[in-house]
Design a protein with these regions (language model features):
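Hydrophobic membrane-insertion alpha-helices, especially the h-region
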Residues: 13-31
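Soluble "head" domains of membrane/secretory-pathway proteins
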Residues: 2-10, 44-211
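Cytochrome P450 fold signature focused on the C-terminal beta-domain
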Residues: 34-35, 121
Length: 211
């Protein structure tokens, strides 16, 4: 009988240990860290297709939302936990694609679709692309994949290679391309932006999202 009790006690302790381990791992993945698989070659050579990365959620704070509502493509409310840091230029970020169902007229996050890209500009920066190279006014730091920028700069007729050169905000008067872009000021908290025609084109969707 004592032997049976010992075996039962061992299994009970093991069950409690496994349960606590699962709970701790779940909470760590929810609030602290999570992993993602790189789905394409767009981040090469730094990250290759199939690589896995570990994301630190504590920098800007974990997001909490109803996963089941998101899976059903319903509107959701996102609550962000407090974070303890800020992003830096050239950091690798994981974020949600800002549009759904190929609708480009307004921002509507698809929280189940993740992108992995490099941070080029920060709030308060003014971003430009000149002759294919990324530039931040007042910053001499090399940004992004320099070799890829150099290859794009050396292409005389990128359209022949299936490259779409037109880009945001897709306005004929501004005529921005992936080789000649900006200047695009990145607003920061507390900054006032004058709503002229250009700024309306640049920030209309962001203003609509924040409202």
């Amino acid at each position: 009988m004592n032997r049976v009790k010992k075996v039962v006690a061992i299994f009970e302790n093991l069950a409690v240990f496994l349960f606590c381990t699962v709970v701790i791992l779940f909470l760590m993945q929810l609030f602290c860290f999570t992993s993602f698989r790189i789905p394409s070659d767009s981040m090469e050579p730094a990250l290759k297709d199939g690589d896995r990365i570990l994301v630190n959620k504590m920098i800007k704070g974990a997001r909490l939302f109803d996963v089941f509502a998101a899976l059903n493509n319903e509107d959701i409310t996102i609550h962000r936990m407090p974070g303890w840091g800020n992003f830096k230029r050239n950091d690798i970020l994981v974020f949600n694609f800002p549009y759904r169902m190929n609708r480009w007229d307004s921002i509507r996050l698809d929280v189940m679709q993740y992108y992995v890209k490099r941070c080029i500009a920060l709030p308060g920066d003014t971003l430009e692309i000149r002759e294919g190279f990324y530039k931040i006014r007042g910053c001499d730091e090399r940004l992004g994949n320099y070799n890829a920028q150099q290859s794009l700069a050396n292409l005389k007729y990128p359209e022949q290679y299936g490259i779409v050169v037109g880009t945001f905000p897709y306005d004929k008067q501004m005529d921005w391309t992936i080789r000649e872009f900006g200047p695009l000021p990145i607003p920061q908290k507390g900054q006032t932006v004058k709503m002229n025609r250009t700024n309306c084109l640049l920030y209309r969707q962001l203003i609509g999202w924040e409202q």
